[in-house]
Each structure stands twice: as structure tokens, then as C-alpha cells.
From Swiss-Prot:
Involved in the assimilation of dimethylsulphoniopropionate (DMSP), an important compound in the fixation of carbon in marine phytoplankton, by mediating the conversion of 3-(methylthio)propanoyl-CoA (MMPA-CoA) to 3-(methylthio)acryloyl-CoA (MTA-CoA). It catalyses: 3-(methylsulfanyl)propanoyl-CoA + oxidized [electron-transfer flavoprotein] + H(+) = 3-(methylsulfanyl)acryloyl-CoA + reduced [electron-transfer flavoprotein]. GO terms for molecular function: flavin adenine dinucleotide binding; oxidoreductase activity, acting on the CH-CH group of donors, with a flavin as acceptor. It comes from Ruegeria pomeroyi (strain ATCC 700808 / DSM 15171 / DSS-3). Belongs to the acyl-CoA dehydrogenase family. This is 3-methylmercaptopropionyl-CoA dehydrogenase. Coiled coil: none annotated. Its EC number is 1.3.99.41. The active site is at E435 (proton acceptor). It comes from the Bacteria. Its cofactor is FAD. The gene is dmdC. The lineage of its organism: Bacteria, Pseudomonadati, Pseudomonadota, Alphaproteobacteria, Rhodobacterales. Disruption phenotype: Cells lacking this gene do not grow on methylmercaptopropionate (MMPA) as the sole source of carbon.
Length: 588
């Protein structure tokens, strides 16, 4: 199945929604210009379209295989990964001092979308490696950074995240994996980890596992978790690998989707591990990687939605079926001319471009939080932390919806595997689950991002949206409609926020029963806000004589989102505030 990277759409979002002038002005990115980002993404888009997208169907059909303890990916994956490494794509948004290209994180997020649109199974390997790089960059010792970062940033070595155990899923207080100190300063790691993405494979030269485990005298619960680097192959000071560590993949999961991404059950048998940071601080360190991975999984949602939309749009243009309801033609017409097919396609486009807008905006905040001037970092960090669970939770839930609509547009053919669109739906279904379910994101949003600061960041978020409404109200007819719907959605958000702040202390069960509706309401509002900003940018570009067809489509997409999606905020508000006794007391 063909894939065309939407670089023009992505670059429009980066230029107008990522606070690019502020990002570009950061000392870290002083030599980076918008054209550099465009050139990199255009080249990467070509690479992914030509080399990686053709693997998607093969990977789904054949899947990863476990052969005598060795995981083998389908034919073509190793060749594509070698070229991915040789061309430096893993290094795109990582620091130049460790061999990276040094582009902003928001550009890296765009690349994450492109590679995961091409093939989500392939894209998961660099995604987890990026998370390992982020974690070690912040928490690793100088020696660990010097030894591991350049190899991970090139992609020669890949990274994983080992949290989950059979008895410890979302509840990491139940982790039992042990880490026993050794005389040489290393630790002997023992235990079983499950659901480890790319835990074993044949793409990279080595695999660097980041493992949560307990030392013998560790406190109970999550306070007793420590983080360890546990490489598949032990390496000398020069990085040459020789001896295999005492760990291995004992089985692979048989999955609904992303079948070429090996999901491993890993067994550690006194494997040599190296402590990262301090003992009993592992969960705090791992949250760095988890935040990176959660944001990236939200971007995967945009990626699979884009792929499903491209496929559905192409099919709707070609499929001839039925005369138009208005009698404008006597013969059957392409189904794209039928009103409900248009409704579905335009909803797909609005949700996809809206998710991209939200993800790109969040990427800009992440860049400013990490590299901005000291006085501006606190607000940028607060906004980034507020938005990440929205990107993860909202964008992935919408991705499943978009993929489902793609199947629906294909009719009966969509239910046939050979058409290919069923794969998008199957691949998308994991997104609201792994790296923290939607409920986990909603609990994080409500508990850590709203209740912890008494709603201060949430209210600042609403203030920024109100300012955008003011600008939209001065624009054209579509912009004014968007402003009205944004104001209505913001009012629903404010009422829901006040209700949760008032309820949480008295009746936490009732408050948290509304946490997912609150996440979806906030996600709708945040996305509508960013699309409103997109419409304003498009109006400004039109006034300068820009491409009318492209820019008017941006305005129309924002308008459609406002009229078809933002109106759902009132229903989400009702779900938050009208949580009846039945929801909490009905027998199950």
C-alpha cells in the first residue's frame, strides 16, 4: 500500500503552531532554519515511502518469529533498518555533541509520524530507542552517557523499556524483579518482564534494556524501584561486543496488530546490570522515558490516522456506486460524491489534522521547556506536562475512530484483509492501551496536572484559548463560527474543571469516574484551539496571496472540527458532572 508523507501539512503546522520563532531563537537551535527542517522531512518522507511503507503488509502477514531464542523479522526489515541507520535518521533530533543532527524535538515528532505512518511495526524500534536516549541523557552518569549515547543515537544499538511483569501491569508497586549488588559495582538482575517491545530482534548490533528492579533492602512499593542498564551483549571500553549477557527472550506474544514488532517475554538470570542514578529513584527516572514514549505513542495515533485517511480518500475517489441523491447524474458516481461518505472523510481529515496540530504544538512546548530561557521554562514545562496526556489519550482514541471510519468507507471490502485497511484498525487498537491506557492518562491529567496545582495550569490553558477566540472573532465567517464553538467548549471545560476541583477531595471515586470524559473534553478543546490558530494562519497567508486551495482547506478543516467535533464537549461535560449513583453502585 502506497504512502505519501504529508510534508506540506506537517510543515504548515510546525511553522504556525509550534511557536517556531521562539524555538528557532533558542541558542540550542541557533543554526537551524525552517528550510532545514523541511529538507530533512522531505528526504525522510521519500525514504519512508520507498523503503519502509512496502514492508507494512509483509510484516503484518509474516510477523516476527522466535527461532531458537533468536527473533527474526520478515525479509526486508534488516535492509531497511541498516539504511535508516546509515542515513542518520535515528539521530535527527538528538544533540550534535553525541553525534545527532541537532534538530528540534518538534521536528523529531514529525519524523515519528512519518515513519509510523509508513509502518508502525518498524517505527516502534526507533521510538523506544529515542526514549532510552532521553532517559540516559538526563539521568545517566557521565560515563554512561559517553559510553551509550552515541551508539543509541546512531541507531547501531537500540533501546527498550522493561517495566511490566505478569503481576505488575499499571500497578508498578508489585514489581518483583531483583537487583543484587556485586563486588565489582554491578548488579545481578533476575526476573521476568513481559510485553517488552523489540526486547529481542535482529536489526541492531546490541540492545540496551532499561529495567526496573528492586535491591535487597529496598522499601516496599514504587519507592523501592531502581533503574538499571542491562545490555544484551556486554561490551568492552571501546564498545566492541563479545560476551552475551545472561538474559533472553523466552517467547513472543501473538497479537491483534503490529505483528512485525516483536513483543517479548524477557527472562533475566543474574544478568549484569548497571545502576542508573541513585537506588530507589528508578520510577522517577523511568518517567522521563515514559513521558517521551507516551508523547510518541500519541504521535503514532496521528500517523495511523493519516495512513487510514489516505487509503480511504483514494478508495472513495475510485469506487463507483449509486446515483447521487439530488439527481444531478443519471449514472452511478464515485462514492466521494455521496454526502455521508463526505461526512466520514472530512471527519477523518479533521481528527487527523487536529491530532497533528495538537502534537506539533506540544512538541514546541517540549522544546521550550528543555532549552528555553530560565524565566520561561516553568510555564513551558507546565504546559507540556498538561498537554502530553492529551496527546497520548485523545489522539490515540481518535486514531481508532479514524481507522474504523476508514474500514466503513470501504464497505464490505474494508472487512477483507487483502484490502489492507483492516490492518490500520488492528494496528491502531493498541495505541490507547500501551504506554498507559487512556484511563491512566486521564488519571494523570486529573491527579497530577489539575488537582496538584489547584487548576492553575488548566485555567492558564483556558485563558490562552479565550485570547484565540478574540482573534478568530475578527476574522471571516468560518473563523467567527470557530470562535463561537470554542467559547462554548471552553465554558463546558471550565464548568467540568470546577466540578472536579470541588468533588475530588470529598468523593474521589465520583471525580475519577469522570476523568476520561474530562480528558476527551479537554482534548477536543485543545485540538479545536490549535485548529483555530491554524485557520488564523491560513487567513493571514491568503491575505499575502498564498495558495488558495491549500489554505482554504485548512480553514474548512478547522470549521468542520468546530461544527462536528467541538459540539461533543457538552456531552462530555454532562458525563463529568452527572455521574449518577448507578455508575458507582450498579452490580456487575
Amino acid at each position: 500500500m502506497t504512502y505519501q508523507a504529508p510534508v506540506r501539512d506537517i510543515m504548515f503546522a510546525i511553522e504556525h503552531l509550534s511557536q517556531w520563532p521562539q524555538v528557532e531563537a533558542l541558542q540550542t537551535y541557533s543554526e537551524i532554519e525552517l528550510d532545514d527542517a523541511r529538507a530533512a522531512l522531505e528526504e525522510f518522507g521519500r525514504f519512508c515511502g520507498e523503503m519502509i511503507a512496502p514492508l507494512s503488509t509483509i510484516g503484518d502477514t509474516e510477523g516476527a518469529r522466535l527461532e531458537n531464542g533468536r527473533v527474526v523479522l520478515p525479509e526486508g526489515y534488516k535492509t531497511a533498518y541498516d539504511q535508516f541507520v546509515d542515513m542518520g535518521w535515528q539521530s535527527l533530533s538528538h544533540p550534535a555533541e553525541h553525534g545527532g543532527m541537532g534538530l528540534p524535538k518538534v521536528v523529531g515528532a514529525a519524523a515519528t509520524e512519518i515513519v509510523n505512518s509508513a509502518d508502525m511495526s518498524f517505527g516502534l524500534c526507533p521510538l523506544l530507542t529515542n526514549g532510552a536516549i532521553d532517559a540516559l541523557s538526563i539521568t545517566g552518569s557521565d560515563a554512561q552517557k559517553a559510553f551509550y549515547l552515541d551508539k543509541l543515537i546512531t541507531g547501531r544499538w537500540s533501546g527498550t523499556m522493561n517495566l511490566t511483569e505478569p503481576q505488575a501491569g499499571s500497578d508498578l508497586s508489585r514489581v518483583r524483579c531483583t537487583a543484587v549488588p556485586q563486588d565489582d559495582g554491578t548488579y545481578a538482575i533476575s526476573g521476568t518482564k513481559i510485553f517488552i517491545t523489540f526486547g529481542e530482534h535482529d536489526l541492531s548490533e546490541n540492545i540496551v534494556h532499561l529495567v526496573l528492579a528492586r535491591t535487597p533492602d529496598a522499601p516496599e512499593g514504587v519507592r523501592g524501584l531502581s533503574l538499571f542498564v542491562v545490555p544484551k551483549l556486554l561490551a568492552g571500553e571501546g564498545g566492541e561486543t563479545s560476551q552475551r549477557n545472561t538474559l533472553g527472550c523466552v517467547s513472543l506474544e501473538h497479537k491483534l496488530g503490529v505483528r512485525a514488532s516483536p513483543t517479548a517475554v524477557m527472562e533475566y538470570d543474574n544478568a549484569t546490570g548497571y545502576l542508573v542514578g541513585e537506588e530507589n529513584s528508578g520510577l522517577r527516572y523511568m518517567f522521563i522515558m515514559m513521558t517521551s514514549a507516551r508523547y510518541a505513542v500519541g504521535v503514532q495515533g496521528v500517523a495511523i490516522a493519516e495512513r487510514a485517511y489516505q487509503h480511504a480518500l483514494s478508495y472513495a475517489r475510485d469506487r463507483i456506486q449509486s446515483r447521487p441523491v439530488d439527481g444531478s447524474a443519471q449514472d452511478a458516481v464515485p462514492i466521494i460524491q455521496h454526502p455521508d461518505v463526505r461526512r466520514m472523510l472530512l471527519r477523518m481529515r479533521a481528527l487527523t489534522e487536529g491530532g497533528r496540530a495538537l502534537a506539533i504544538a506540544t512538541g514546541g512546548w517540549l522544546d521550550l521547556a528543555e532549552h528555553g530561557p530560565e524565566e520561561a521554562r516553568a510555564e513551558a514545562q507546565s504546559m507540556a506536562e498538561f498537554l502530553v496526556p492529551l496527546v497520548k489519550g485523545f489522539c490515540t482514541e481518535r486514531a481508532v475512530e479514524v481507522a474504523s471510519l476508514g474500514v466503513q468507507i470501504h464497505g464490505g471490502m474494508g472487512f477483507i484483509e487483502e484490502t489492507g485497511v483492516a490492518q490500520f484498525y488492528r494496528d491502531a487498537r493498541i495505541l490507547p492501551i500501551y504506554e498507559g491506557t487512556t484511563a491512566i492518562q486521564a488519571n494523570d491529567l486529573l491527579g497530577r496536572k489539575v488537582l496538584r496545582d489547584g487548576g492553575r495550569t488548566a485555567r492558564r490553558f483556558a485563558e490562552m484559548i479565550a485570547a484565540t477566540e478574540g482573534e478568530l472573532s475578527k476574522g471571516g465567517a468560518a473563523a467567527q463560527r470557530i470562535a463561537q464553538r470554542l467559547a462554548e467548549a471552553r465554558a463546558a471545560f471550565a464548568a467540568g474543571l470546577d466540578h472536579l476541583l470541588a468533588t475530588a477531595g470529598q468523593d474521589p471515586n465520583r471525580a475519577y469516574a469522570g476523568s476520561v470524559p474530562f480528558l476527551m473534553l479537554t482534548g477536543n478543546l485543545a485540538t479545536g484551539w490549535q485548529l483555530g490558530l491554524s485557520a488564523l494562519a491560513a487567513e493571514a497567508e491568503l491575505a499575502k496571496g498564498g495558495d488558495a486551495e491549500f489554505l482554504q482547506a485548512k480553514i474548512a478543516t478547522a470549521d468542520i472540527f468546530a461544527q462536528q467535533v467541538l459540539v461533543e464537549c457538552s456531552a462530555e461535560h454532562s458525563r463529568i458532572t452527572d455521574t449518577g449513583d448507578s455508575l458507582l453502585t450498579a452490580s456487575l
